């Protein structure tokens, strides 16, 4: 049991946070957040960060660890998460990793690939091509060269599009090949519990309702406060978080409120689609439909069964 790590993964708005808080009442878990948006301070509403009350009941590690103008990589996450896992296990508890940043889960469990260093000449060539042809053209090129990676990143995520194409041009191999290749893996046994709503319409409706709730709770004001406090630019990694980019563009006068709302909801649904793509191909995951009544009871029973078997063995 001293090498057992549970992972609760799933798309945005599938109910991960509420379930994680419930699991803490049944098991000696300590929660590590696996969310590339919740790492940022002052970004609370738009990231659906657990409430103060929830954090008092169920503290989360790796929340509020970076300023919005800072960056954070999958490699940094692995270092932090593995260190926390060791500390939690040393205290006699069990790590529970909760979130939807599938690239972090992948890097943690399968190891990080040794990717080539950035090449200024290749990057300049790609930027010139983007200026002349547009980033949509480069995204389509990536979709042809590496459809697996293209399906996992947003069509407007220029930084990741550029990096994926750069890796291909430098090595002749796709980024997805690197990520799925054999790497040094941590000495833990990961149990992957995946929330996987079968009805996309149910998830889409929840996403729309949650985005509207965020707007009502002051999402726009939160972005304005970020602008007042930090030198916020649209190309910052923090502004890749869904909703923030759309509100920034709305505040800049690029489109009206209703268009911003529609774009924010659409971007969140696209994020959920990419997360589900990761999960669909996740080997050995235990899938639960969070739309079903009693799914949490099924998960609790499975965890108890795994822990009982681990102790008896």
UniProtKB/Swiss-Prot annotation:
Its cofactor is Mg(2+). InterPro entries: Dimethylallyltransferase, IPT, P-loop_NTPase. GO terms for biological process: tRNA modification. Keywords: ATP-binding, Magnesium, Nucleotide-binding, Transferase, tRNA processing. It catalyses: adenosine(37) in tRNA + dimethylallyl diphosphate = N(6)-dimethylallyladenosine(37) in tRNA + diphosphate. Its EC number is 2.5.1.75. ATP binds at residues 10-17. NCBIfam families: miaA. Belongs to the IPP transferase family. This is tRNA dimethylallyltransferase.
């Amino acid at each position: 049991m001293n090498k057992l790590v549970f992972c609760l993964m799933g798309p945005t708005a599938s109910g991960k946070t509420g379930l994680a808080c419930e699991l803490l009442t049944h098991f000696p878990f300590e929660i590590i957040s696996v969310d590339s948006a919740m790492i940022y301070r002052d970004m609370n509403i738009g990231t659906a960060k657990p409430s103060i009350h929830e954090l008092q009941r169920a503290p989360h590690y790796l929340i509020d660890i970076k300023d919005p103008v800072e960056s954070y990589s999958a490699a940094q996450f692995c270092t932090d998460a593995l260190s926390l896992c060791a500390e939690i296990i040393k205290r006699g508890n069990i790590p529970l990793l909760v979130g939807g940043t599938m690239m972090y889960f992948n890097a943690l469990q399968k190891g990080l690939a040794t990717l080539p260093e950035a090449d200024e000449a290749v990057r300049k060539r790609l930027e010139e091509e983007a200026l002349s042809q547009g980033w949509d053209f480069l995204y389509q090129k990536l979709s042809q060269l590496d459809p697996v990676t293209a399906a996992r990143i947003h069509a407007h995520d220029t930084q990741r599009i550029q990096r994926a194409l750069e890796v291909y041009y430098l090595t002749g191999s796709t980024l997805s090949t690197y990520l799925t290749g054999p790497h040094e893996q941590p000495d833990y046994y990961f149990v992957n519990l995946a929330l996987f709503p079968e009805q996309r319409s149910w998830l889409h409706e929840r996403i729309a309702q949650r985005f509207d709730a965020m707007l009502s709770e002051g999402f726009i004001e939160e972005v304005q406060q970020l602008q007042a406090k930090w030198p916020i630019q649209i190309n910052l990694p923090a502004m890749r978080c869904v909703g923030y980019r759309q509100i920034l563009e709305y505040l800049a006068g690029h489109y009206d409120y209703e268009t911003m709302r529609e774009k924010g909801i659409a971007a969140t649904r696209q994020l959920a689609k990419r997360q589900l793509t990761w999960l669909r191909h996740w080997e050995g995951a235990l899938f639960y439909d969070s739309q079903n009544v009693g799914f949490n009871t099924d998960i609790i029973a499975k965890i108890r069964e795994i822990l009982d078997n681990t102790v008896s063995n």
